[in-house]
Structure formats: structure tokens, C-alpha cells
């Protein structure tokens, strides 16, 4: 069932299954995305809830090859001290990424605390990166900032941006735009809540393809348990599907902005995500029967 149909709206160039919608406004696309923060994070650490609300939205625009313009927020507040911490986190995120919050809405005296942000960005039409266009034969390239830490109370949130300079953090986002402008990748997705492998699964599902990934090739800090790492939200991480001849150039672009990169696998037409360690191989997702998001790409 198509609950929110976009057919019949010719201005919609990309929607369901993408990190941001792409809206045709003439010589470029306006990118439009939104993210809500899990209630558990708001309860555990409202500061990081506010900061991550900014970060995840900026990442969504970057993943499309775009550059962010501005955000609006919606806050629901029951405790004033929680509100202050959320705002403090958002303020630090605004300063870090250089993207303003220009308005929004507050629900005061609510029965719960919540923060949601929506963002707009822009991208040239020929530089748009989708997550639904990975193709059999593509290399799978992971680029990840492995210089970070886990806050004591956030087991699966790997923080890489708060301790870095504003310039390097913004350059990391700009690196994705460079990949788009140089037409180096067929598809891109920012590593989000399901971790790097889970994010790849979302890309493959939406692209209606499969892949095999060697987990031993995935960039990782030396002192982190591998299972924890693969389940972690990455402060800065992107998954690309690209022609093999472009893989090294993508890795080189990100090496200049404190990110490790590697070819970790290959896209195929199996519609299965298979993991190997060089000895054993197992199927993680079989998209003939497994569903991650259920999203399908927009038909052109």
C-alpha cells in the first residue's frame, strides 16, 4: 500500500527510501529531511539528544551529495531542565556544523520530552547521490571516522565530532558533496542507527540488489569489541556503492578529513546481504523475505 503517494507530483525527484527528498526547483534540487530522536536517548542524555538531532539531519543532507541550508525544530517538554539541556546540545550542534535553526514549535507542559528537527539543503541536479541506485558489480566502500569515544551511558553511540574542530567536521560533510560532484559513486548512505552493516542493508534493500561483505575489512578502532562496533551509530560514517575504478579516489578524499576508508565488499544481484570473515559466510538478510524498511525507490 502506498500510504504517502508521490506519483502525480512531477517536482518530486526522490522520496521514499532516500535519506532526504529531492524537490525540483529549476536548476537544482532542494533537499528536505526530518529526524526524531529516540525517547530513550532524550531520557538518558538530553544534551546529546539535542546535539545528535542536529548531527543526524546534517548527515542526511550530506548523504544526498548536498549542502545544508537551515533547520526548524519541534520540542515537547515536561521538564524545564531537560529543555535547557536539549537546547544546549542544539546550540553546540549549530556552531559545530554551521547550520542555523531558524524557527520551529514548542509544546510546553507536555506529558513527555521530545526533540525533532527538519532540515533543508540543496544540490546540483547532476551531483545528487541516491541510496536506491547501487548496481551489481559496484564496490562497497565504507569511510568512517574511527577517532572517537563512547560516552559512559551511551553504549552504541560512537562520538567523533564534539571533540574535533568545526573546520574538520564541516570538511567531512563537504567530502561527500565532492564525491557527488565528481560523479564517483552510484549510491551513498550515511551510517545511521543500525550501524554500518545495517545501513548497507537499507541501501541494498532499496536498490533491490545484494552484496557480500568481508567484516574484517571494515575500518574500526583497535580497542573496541567488533560486535559493539558493527552495532554502533557512527558519528561520521558513509557507505558508498561505486564503480571499482573510483574506489581509491573516494578513500583518498576522505583520508584528508580524518576518515579511514576501505573496499569492504561487492554488490551483486542476489538480493541477499552476506557476511564473511574469510573463512565462514552467512546470510544476514534475504530480501526475498526479510524487510528492514520496506521502502522502494521512486519510479522515474
Regions found by a protein language model. Give the residues of each.
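Short amphipathic alpha-helices in soluble, non-transmembrane regions
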Residues: 249-259
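Glycine-rich anion-binding loops of enzyme active sites
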Residues: 26-32, 37-39, 67-154, 247, ...
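Small-aliphatic-rich amphipathic alpha-helix that forms the alpha element of a beta-alpha
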Residues: 45-72, 85-96, 171-180, 196-202
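Short, compositionally biased
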Residues: 152-168
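Helix N-cap motif at beta-to-alpha junctions
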Residues: 241-248
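Active-site-proximal betaalpha loop/short-helix elements
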Residues: 166-235
